[in-house]
């Protein structure tokens, strides 16, 4: 089910107000309805289908297991961007775009690892450090968290960018273009629409309008998560917040996904291993492809492996206290329960054992 909104919502949010006519970008001419009191008025008849297309792109990306990066560093967008990304289990940059955040991911990953190390040191009580050293570490953590906190669990470059204000976020858009990453953006009358995959002509300054865009994109991402879980055969109706998506009628879909995700050598041990959660020093046979779990990238796989988790049957056996402990140990901020890893793992296990 597509995310619904109306033209009236856009009107009430002020999405149709562009900039003063002398501040326009001529490339936005096709999207301008007219001029009133020297202010360009955006043609919402074009905005509505364009926004629908962007929402569908976000939903499809997440349903395939992709990652969406919300980008909005201007003051009036920062809070809405962060809230929407967190609510939809996605990622965000709302402070300052660092050069190379996409094109030099290896260096950015090093900074993220430094953030994790500093965080662990401080949470461990910073034993052996002087008061001055603890203060310096605290300041370093705050600086790194502000710059990288929204992408520290992303695990790799995103599959789609959602951008507020293409003028301010030109560097992010250029990096995405270099890597072939599609961009969905709110494009005002003073912006250049070139290079934007999903152009949404609308006001990018009004706080109420920005909040509406972010809410719609977040809802589209959440819908995509539900669709992705449905395609895996997960019982979304048993979740704390079930979605309205229907499970696929063809059980072969689940079987084919599970056969790729679980090594055949593990199936014989499933009955013995799923009664209780256990952490292993090494995988039993070939490790499972944990990246098939929602929101799991290579870095999260490494963290899980370091914690002794290699197989779906381990995660499938987790009870509430096991989830809480592992989540706290790995600082996952509730991701295991939120993204439904246990339910997904059980679906893989059951399909492989059938």
Swiss-Prot record:
Stated name of the protein: Small ribosomal subunit protein uS2
PROSITE patterns noted in UniProt: RIBOSOMAL_S2_1 (PS00962), RIBOSOMAL_S2_2 (PS00963)
Name of the coding gene: rpsB
Gene Ontology annotations for the cellular component aspect, listed alphabetically: cytosolic small ribosomal subunit
Family: Belongs to the universal ribosomal protein uS2 family.
UniProt KW Ribonucleoprotein keyword: yes
Origin organism lineage: Bacteria, Pseudomonadati, Pseudomonadota, Alphaproteobacteria, Hyphomicrobiales
A GO BP annotation: translation
UniProt xrefs under InterPro entries: Ribosomal_uS2, Ribosomal_uS2_bac/mit/plastid, Ribosomal_uS2_CS, Ribosomal_uS2_flav_dom_sf
One Pfam family hit: Ribosomal_S2
GO molecular function terms attached to this record: structural constituent of ribosome
